[in-house]
């Protein structure tokens, strides 16, 4: 008999009492969180979800509190419940995706980000999470595809171009990398973090290539002569790609005291060619 009574739905009066308690607990959780008492806030909000197990917002709030307290598993569980109760709601899905990325659970993050794109097809947030996750999973082509979509949706955002530059650099496509870094530099405010990052990335690429170019020039006077005559063309012919600033710095490093008459002499026979005559 007692079991049957507990299985009966609450009376209207009891339901009103429980809803009022849930509201008080929700407000108390907010107050406690504002005071930095996250553990107590989580306890209050958890009780709200027990009173209202079908309330997606209650689980969403619990998930945010747990994430702030770095209780990752509990946060993921609460946010998943929220997305299950309200599958078309954007905010819980974004919070869940972000939590999974922060926890380095990239496969799961990809799944949630893809689900988010079904809700918000033009979501830059979802694509940002996808590009990070694909990069960490070693899926560079997919990461490039997603960042390409980000550039298309928001072409004036220098951060998108910088990320594409990083991906192109990882794929050893220096021409594309320099192009994207240069765009990021041109679009950024000189005091912004993106400007600094793009400037440092270009300088690093330029410095690495400049060392290789100067080494080649020290061993091949014919290449050195071509550098003196047409720097950009000579660099490109050898497969290098420097930024405008890199070309300017290289120009000042080329030894211009190299005798002009040496260009009239035939190029020396390489060791490989000489070997054929032995």
Residue ranges and their predicted role:
Residues 64, 80, 91-107, 111-149:
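Alpha-helical adaptor scaffolds
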Residues 15-57, 61-68, 95-98, 102:
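Alpha-helical segment of the N-proximal tetratricopeptide repeat
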Residues 47-48, 81-82, 115-116, 149-150, ...:
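Canonical positions in the second alpha-helix
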Residues 27, 61, 95, 129, ...:
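Canonical tetratricopeptide repeat
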Residues 34-35, 68-69, 102-103, 136-137, ...:
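Register position in tetratricopeptide repeats
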């Amino acid at each position: 008999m007692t079991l049957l009574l507990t299985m009966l739905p609450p009376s209207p009066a009891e339901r009103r009492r429980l809803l009022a308690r849930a509201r008080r607990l929700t407000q108390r959780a907010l107050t406690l969180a504002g005071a930095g008492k996250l553990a107590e806030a989580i306890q209050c909000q958890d009780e709200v979800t027990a009173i209202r197990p079908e309330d997606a917002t209650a689980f969403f709030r619990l998930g945010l509190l747990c994430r702030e307290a770095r209780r990752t598993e509990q946060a993921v569980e609460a946010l998943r419940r929220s997305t299950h109760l309200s599958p078309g709601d954007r905010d819980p899905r974004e919070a869940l995706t972000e939590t999974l990325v922060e926890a380095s659970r990239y496969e799961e993050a990809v799944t949630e980000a893809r689900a988010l794109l079904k809700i918000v097809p033009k979501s830059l947030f979802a694509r940002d999470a996808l590009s990070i996750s694909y990069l960490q999973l070693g899926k560079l082509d997919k990461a490039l595809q997603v960042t390409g979509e980000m550039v298309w949706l928001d072409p004036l955002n220098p951060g998108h171009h910088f990320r594409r530059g990083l991906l192109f650099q990882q794929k050893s496509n220096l021409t594309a990398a320099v192009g994207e870094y240069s765009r990021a530099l041109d679009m950024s405010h000189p005091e912004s973090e993106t400007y600094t990052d793009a400037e440092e990335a270009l300088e690093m690429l330029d410095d690495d290539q400049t060392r290789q170019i100067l080494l080649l020039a020290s061993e091949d006077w014919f290449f050195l002569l071509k550098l003196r005559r047409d720097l950009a063309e000579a660099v490109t012919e050898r497969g290098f790609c420097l930024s405008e600033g890199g070309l300017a710095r290289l120009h000042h490093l080329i030894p211009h005291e190299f005798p002009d008459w040496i260009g009239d002499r035939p190029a020396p026979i390489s060791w490989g060619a000489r070997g054929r005559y032995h």
